[in-house]
């Protein structure tokens, strides 16, 4: 587990969660625990995603994947342990002194990472290797597999702050941000190289999988991701100077090279 965490990563989801928490006045000691939980869910998903039965990858974040560095059985258990640890942290009283808030967070994280979210999206991703999916189905796949964890990162601060008027604002922000992130990921798979990206590229093309880039075309995909980021920034601009770091993060999503 230490190996998986220490090899690096962008930590985007916890960064987004902490920035929104700052905007809404959530205490750092509370938001940090939820940020750790979402990052551990993300770590679990990557470890399992890299397994031979899934994407069968041997490189992640520029280092050997968990099942290559250790073995397949260990990698499965590591993923399981990350998932358990995420819920152990988020359910603790230190996360929030209101048990209803903690229950709400647990429910949302379970939905975002389970069959109605990330796991459901991964199932659609496996189906995409066997049959051609429509653009609508690809959008659904990415909304579940990638977008739901972004959604949790954006709404969890509203739950922590008990400010539910902002819930819809940040949920809308997350939908645009998550899709822009996935389009950029698909573009990096086509245009990037393994050294910069930190993982093998060209995988989807080799597997014959349809992606947002293959269906939209590279130029249209770039325009779409740029438009989504511009729309997401407009949503949070009313928060003024407090949203500056969050705006920088949004711009980073389409300017990154890994």
Per-range role (PLM):
Residues 257-258:
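Short cytosolic juxtamembrane segments of multi-pass membrane proteins
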Residues 1-237, 241-254:
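Mg2+-dependent prenyl diphosphate-binding active-site environment of isoprenoid biosynthetic enzymes
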């Amino acid at each position: 587990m230490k190996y998986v965490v220490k090899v690096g990563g962008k930590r985007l989801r916890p960064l987004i969660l902490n920035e929104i928490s700052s905007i809404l006045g959530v205490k750092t000691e509370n938001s940090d625990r939820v940020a750790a939980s979402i990052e551990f869910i993300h770590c679990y998903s990557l470890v399992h995603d890299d397994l031979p039965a899934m994407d069968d990858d041997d490189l992640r974040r520029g280092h050997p994947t968990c099942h290559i560095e250790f073995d397949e059985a260990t990698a499965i258990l590591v993923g399981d342990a990350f998932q358990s640890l995420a819920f152990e942290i988020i359910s603790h009283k230190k996360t929030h002194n209101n048990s209803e808030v903690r229950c709400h967070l647990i429910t949302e994280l379970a939905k975002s990472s389970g069959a109605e979210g990330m796991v459901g999206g991964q199932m659609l991703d496996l189906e995409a290797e066997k049959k051609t999916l429509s653009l609508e189905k690809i959008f659904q796949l990415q909304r579940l597999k990638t977008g739901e964890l972004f959604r949790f990162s954006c709404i969890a601060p509203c739950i922590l702050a008990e400010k539910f008027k902002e819930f819809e604002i940040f949920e809308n922000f997350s939908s645009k941000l998550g899709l822009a992130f996935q389009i950029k990921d698909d573009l990096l798979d086509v245009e990037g190289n393994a050294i910069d990206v930190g993982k093998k590229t060209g995988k989807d093309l080799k597997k014959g999988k349809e992606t947002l880039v293959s269906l939209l075309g590279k130029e249209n995909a770039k325009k779409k991701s740029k438009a989504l980021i511009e729309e997401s920034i407009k949503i949070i601009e009313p928060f003024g100077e407090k949203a500056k770091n969050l705006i920088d993060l949004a711009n980073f999503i389409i300017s990154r090279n890994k």
